[in-house]
Every structure is written in structure tokens, then in C-alpha cells.
Design a protein with these regions (language model features):
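N-acyltransferase acceptor-side catalytic subdomain
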Residues: 1-168
Length: 168
């Protein structure tokens, strides 16, 4: 059984320790690591919301969102601020940090992000999710649970130098 909760972040240093522990159990991109996510986190996330999924008491997924509010509507931005100045260092391979052993919980995590209360306050309207540069599986899971906006989606090209050298 997977338990999912949303909470405000009060201590980024403590979150960083937990995040790095989960990183060791995940196949994640650099852009999902605490090195990227935690860099200037207090400045980049003025209204941070942490999604945490656990199974048998162990954390199996974490996602750091920034919450933006406009009237009754709340928006959660995955791994970004929504502010062009702070989001200029562009995230390329974004997503929910998930342990290898967690199974297929992505859809449940994103559904929870739209619906669950934060600090005891349930949203008046279902939240919109905003994501940039997420994998196709994340896009599909997000669209399956409702309103989602996919922003920038242009990962930087890369070359496998070892393979290039081998080919001559």
C-alpha cells in the first residue's frame, strides 16, 4: 500500500538529506538530484510543497513543487518557480524522484498533487500541474489525472563520446 502526502517545506537542509537517501535508490537524472533541485532552494521555492510517497514506512517518491495562487486556483510547478529569472537555468530531465522498487506509482503521485490538502488546507478547485521537460511516461500520467500544462520540452542534445571513439 502506498501512502502519499503533501506538506510545506520548513527545513531544506533536512529535506536534502532525505532526498539524497532516495537518490541512491533511484535511477534519476542530474536534474532530479538534490545537487540541482536543492541549489538555492529557499530562494527558488518561495511557497514550496513537498510530495512524499511511502510504502511500508519507507519513502519511495519525492517531488518538490512551487505553489502559485491566483484567486481560488492553485498551480503546482514541478521543480521550478514559474518566474523566468529563477528558471533561466533550464531544467532538462525533470520528474518525480522515484525509488526503483516503488512500482508504477507516478499516476497516483500526480493525482495526489492535484487533490490532497497542504497543511490541512484542501484546494477549492483541483490544482493545475505545470511541468517542463518531463519524460513521456510523466506526461501520460499527468494527462490521465487531469489538468496539466507542459512547458518547455527541449532536452539538450548529447553525444556518447565512448561510443563515438569506438566507432572510429
Amino acid at each position: 500500500v502506498t501512502t502519499i502526502a503533501l506538506a510545506r517545506v520548513a527545513d531544506f537542509a533536512a529535506l536534502g538529506e532525505r532526498w539524497r537517501m532516495l537518490e541512491a535508490q533511484a535511477d534519476c537524472s542530474f536534474f532530479q538530484s538534490w545537487t540541482w533541485t536543492g541549489c538555492l532552494a529557499a530562494e527558488r521555492f518561495p511557497d514550496p510543497v513537498l510530495l512524499e510517497a511511502s510504502q511500508a514506512g519507507d519513502t519511495v517518491a519525492l517531488a518538490l513543487f512551487n505553489r502559485r495562487r491566483f484567486l481560488l486556483r492553485q498551480t503546482l510547478l514541478l521543480g521550478e518557480t514559474g518566474d523566468g529569472v529563477h528558471d533561466t537555468p533550464y531544467i532538462e530531465y525533470n520528474g518525480v524522484l522515484t525509488a526503483r522498487r516503488a512500482g508504477d506509482i507516478l499516476r497516483d503521485c500526480l493525482r495526489a498533487a492535484r487533490r490532497l490538502p497542504v497543511a490541512g488546507m484542501r484546494p477549492w478547485l483541483l490544482r493545475q500541474l505545470v511541468m517542463s521537460s518531463v519524460e513521456d511516461a510523466t506526461v501520460e500520467a499527468a494527462r490521465a489525472v487531469g489538468r496539466v500544462a507542459i512547458r518547455n520540452s527541449s532536452p539538450a542534445p548529447s553525444i556518447d563520446l565512448a561510443r563515438l571513439r569506438e566507432s572510429g
